[in-house]
Amino acid sequence: MSTVTEFPSATAKARYVRVSATKARRVIDLVRGKSVEEALDILRWAPQAASEPVAKVIASAAANAQNNEGLDPSTLVVATVYADEGPTAKRIRPRAQGRAFRIRKRTSHITVIVESRPPKQKGASAASARSRRAQGSKAAATKKSAETKEGSE
């Protein structure tokens, strides 16, 4: 799968990781779109066992971006991250009365693409959005009070 990005990027892959793809995806969804530092911090405290290999791949992608592409590590964002299923190793578990159950040891391929994005001024935009909302609610409140005064007269 080739992914074209609008920002400078770097890729890292971990193949044949001994964790199922569904369990890896559970952890991956926590960090998609976050900055690399924030993603590694989230994974450091995540209780899931899959967080360790995912964190290693993100750290490797960040190192690739810094060493191979010459990108600033403070501007890196986890742009694309996904886990595909790898081959499944099959084992036999002996059970009672001569039966045998199959154990599936699932593997996955984890891919991470980090991009160097310019920092956003989210503090100013969030404050302006709050002020717009507050102005709208104030206008609605004054309009409602004016209507109730007209109705009582």
Swiss-Prot record:
CDD domains tied to this protein: Ribosomal_L22
Q: Where is the composition biased (Basic and acidic residues)?
A: 144-153
The Gene Ontology CC terms held by the record are:
cytosolic large ribosomal subunit
Q: Where is this region: Disordered?
A: 110-153
Its BP terms in the Gene Ontology are: translation
User: Does RNA-binding appear among the keywords?
Assistant: yes
Q: List, alphabetically, the PROSITE patterns matched.
A: RIBOSOMAL_L22
Q: Which UniProt keywords apply?
A: Ribonucleoprotein, Ribosomal protein, RNA-binding, rRNA-binding
Pfam families assigned: Ribosomal_L22 (PF00237)
SUPFAM superfamilies according to UniProt:
Ribosomal protein L22
GO terms assigned for molecular function: rRNA binding; structural constituent of ribosome
Statement: the UniProt record of this protein carries the keyword Ribonucleoprotein:
yes
Gene3D superfamilies given for it?
Ribosomal protein L22/L17
Which InterPro entries does this UniProt record tie to the protein?
Ribosomal_uL22, Ribosomal_uL22_bac/chlpt-type, Ribosomal_uL22_bac/org-type, Ribosomal_uL22_CS, Ribosomal_uL22_sf
Quaternary structure? Answer: Part of the 50S ribosomal subunit.
Instruction: Give the family, as the similarity comment puts it.
Output: Belongs to the universal ribosomal protein uL22 family.
PANTHER family with a match to the protein in the record: CHLOROPLAST 50S RIBOSOMAL PROTEIN L22-RELATED, LARGE RIBOSOMAL SUBUNIT PROTEIN UL22M
Function comment: This protein binds specifically to 23S rRNA; its binding is stimulated by other ribosomal proteins, e.g. L4, L17, and L20. It is important during the early stages of 50S assembly. It makes multiple contacts with different domains of the 23S rRNA in the assembled 50S subunit and ribosome.
Q: What's this protein's name?
A: Large ribosomal subunit protein uL22
- Write the lineage as a comma-separated list: Bacteria, Bacillati, Actinomycetota, Actinomycetes, Mycobacteriales
